């Protein structure tokens, strides 16, 4: 306590308990140990605000890496600190430092000397300072790339943002580049709203001569206004960067390739047409068509007949159309692609005309009428059969009536008409044929 009254601090050790005791003695003491130049304004307690004393604070000066030394008048957030100014500095009136400050000042002075000699340490500290310089003026920004589009449109951003050190995203430092990101005068806005696309022409000439005439040739024929064409050419120019140069010319190359392919295909087509004279006709795999294809020009007579035979052994049926032959082949394969959509029916047929005939049984339509007796029939073969009864005489009229009745009740099946007639009423068919034999 005697040393405290005389104004000298005891020489404490480095133990935490001794440091805590010294701090408590300072706080509880009302003697003018920590007298400040304006200590008359603070008369309470012995607790004084942290301020720099007349003597230099070694603690603040020994921490160069933790002080943010930024002095910018244009920035909204300025932090001006002196060479030794720090919030951690202790007030002291004695010109000579106390034991506490002396020990730590020697410690931090050694650190400062070592850090000044170490190049890696100084590089790290300078990096911290530069990051702090680029960080604090951008406190108001919400996006890391706002300097791209706010440099020319907003005046609240300080000028050092646009004129400061170039960061990693400032890749277009050339004033003649297509996007003026470092010009605070707003050249981006003026270039986007210019009336004529001459600037784009001058910029396109630096990339590739193939794109120099795109804006005039593409928009002069369509009648687009110069402003609209300029905006479109701007977006078109954005695609002409180095990464897209190999993509855009593929349209012209594709047209040339299509021309080459069409030429090659036309050559192949002419060769095939020379071997096959009737190229417009649908291809057929029947034996007659294959024989005519094998004979070449000598098989012109077979092609002229237009006969298509069934290739199934033992059948030998011949049709004049390929569609009829295909429908006939469904009889052999059992394929029935035509389905009745009537409620709860679902029957399937091999031919479309059979499906239409079957639908008449649901609707009750009788399309075919006899010109003699005015009777109506659902099927044309039933009508022709009925007409034979009129021409044969009165003997077959009774049978024709019975045939008409059965035709109204009969539902068509997926069988040939000959089998249907024989299966429904073989007696009538015999009577119908007997007058012909007699005559």
From Swiss-Prot:
Biased composition (Basic and acidic residues): 429-439
Residue ranges covered by zinc fingers (C2H2-type): 308-332, 338-362, 368-390
Recorded GO MF terms: DNA-binding transcription factor activity, RNA polymerase II-specific; RNA polymerase II cis-regulatory region sequence-specific DNA binding; zinc ion binding
Superkingdom per UniProt: Eukaryota
Major localization class: nucleus
Compartments (UniProt record): Nucleus
SMART domains xrefs: ZnF_C2H2 (SM00355)
Key word 4Fe-4S present: no
Cited SUPFAM superfamilies: beta-beta-alpha zinc fingers
Keywords: DNA-binding, Metal-binding, Nucleus, Repeat, Transcription, Transcription regulation, Zinc, Zinc-finger
Disordered as annotated region, ranges: 384-439
Cellular component, GO, one term: nucleus
Chain ranges for the short sequence motif 9aaTAD as given in the UniProt record: 166-174
UniProt-listed GO biological process terms: embryonic limb morphogenesis; embryonic pectoral fin morphogenesis; positive regulation of fibroblast growth factor receptor signaling pathway; regulation of transcription by RNA polymerase II
Primary role: Transcription factor which plays a key role in limb development. Positively regulates FGF8 expression in the apical ectodermal ridge (AER) and contributes to limb outgrowth in embryos.
Family (UniProt): Belongs to the Sp1 C2H2-type zinc-finger protein family.
Domain notes: The 9aaTAD motif is a transactivation domain present in a large number of yeast and animal transcription factors. In SP9, the motif is inactive.
Protein known as: Transcription factor Sp9
Species this chain originates from: Danio rerio (Zebrafish)
């Amino acid at each position: 306590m005697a040393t405290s009254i005389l104004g000298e601090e005891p020489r404490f050790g480095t133990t935490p308990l001794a440091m805590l005791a010294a701090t408590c003695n300072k706080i509880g003491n009302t003697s003018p140990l920590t007298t400040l130049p304006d200590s008359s304004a603070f008369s309470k307690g012995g607790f004084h605000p942290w301020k720099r004393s007349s003597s230099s604070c070694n603690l603040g000066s020994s921490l160069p890496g933790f002080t943010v030394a930024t002095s910018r008048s244009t920035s909204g957030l300025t932090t001006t600190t002196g060479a030794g100014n720090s919030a951690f500095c202790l007030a002291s009136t004695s010109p000579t430092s106390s034991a506490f400050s002396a020990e730590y000042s020697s410690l931090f002075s050694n650190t400062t000397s070592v850090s000044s000699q170490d190049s890696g340490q100084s590089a790290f500290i300078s990096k911290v300072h530069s990051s702090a310089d680029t960080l604090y003026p951008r406190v108001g920004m919400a996006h890391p790339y706002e300097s791209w589009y706010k440099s020319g449109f907003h005046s609240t951003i300080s000028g050092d943002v646009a004129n400061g050190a170039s960061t990693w995203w400032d890749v277009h430092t050339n004033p003649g580049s297509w996007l003026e990101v470092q010009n605070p005068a707003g050249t981006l806005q003026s270039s986007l709203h210019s009336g004529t696309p001459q600037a784009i022409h001058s910029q396109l000439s630096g990339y590739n001569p193939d794109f120099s005439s795109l804006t005039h040739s593409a928009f002069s024929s369509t009648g687009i206004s110069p402003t609209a064409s300029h905006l479109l050419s701007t977006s078109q120019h954005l695609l002409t960067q180095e990464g897209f140069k190999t993509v855009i010319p593929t349209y012209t190359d594709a047209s040339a390739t299509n021309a080459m392919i069409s030429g090659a295909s036309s050559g192949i087509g002419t060769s095939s047409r020379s071997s096959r004279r009737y190229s417009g006709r649908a291809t057929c795999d029947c034996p007659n068509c294959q024989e005519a294809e094998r004979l070449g020009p000598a098989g012109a007579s077979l092609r002229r007949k237009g006969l298509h035979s069934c290739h199934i052994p033992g059948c030998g049926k011949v049709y004049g159309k390929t569609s009829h032959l295909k429908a006939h082949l469904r009889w052999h394969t059992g394929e029935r692609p035509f389905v009745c959509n009537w409620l709860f029916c679902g029957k399937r047929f091999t031919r479309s005309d059979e499906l239409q005939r079957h639908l008449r049984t649901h609707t009750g339509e009788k399309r075919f009428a006899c010109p003699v007796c005015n009777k109506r029939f659902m099927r044309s073969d039933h009508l022709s059969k009925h007409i034979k009864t009129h021409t044969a005489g009165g003997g077959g009229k009774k049978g024709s009536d019975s045939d008409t009745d059965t035709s109204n009740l009969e539902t068509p099946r997926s069988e040939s008409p000959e089998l249907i007639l024989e299966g429904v009423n073989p007696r009538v068919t015999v009577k119908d044929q007997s007058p012909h034999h007699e005559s």
